[in-house]
């Protein structure tokens, strides 16, 4: 049967005044975010306070990692806590109501997440996902940049919580307590060239993220 594709402009959400006010001046941002999410589902954030230098450095570190020999990367293979390297063709996402993904994804990914100290009760109990990251030992400065990037994006996400609350007509402080011990999940992905994708084959199949917010750098 024939299908049509509807194209919509992505909304640009300007956080400049909001961040400059320390989060006190919400203005019309909640309404803008709600409209964007209800009508498109994604939006551009501008004047977000993340430096161009940091974005440049994280892309450079991603290239450095994915340029490593295959055996160096697979030595850090993803573990039961979902931290580590995932080879191309190893995953098939299923969280989508729009497409039944039947082929394995072609992307390669190195996964990092919030680290928890040995005194964390969940980690002491052996609860899954509460662990330390796996780090390559032959990339000087890599861990520092990845950690800085994750901490910076986490900070931005927390600053945006009052906007999400207001967009849902909730008190501005509503989400704060739920993110005091947040879990940040960072996928450092690489999409190697594929001469021709097969039918229903994707670099990363259609899916819905399970986290509260997802940031994609451009």
Region spans (language model):
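Peripheral, non-catalytic segments flanking oxidoreductase cores
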Residues: 1-218
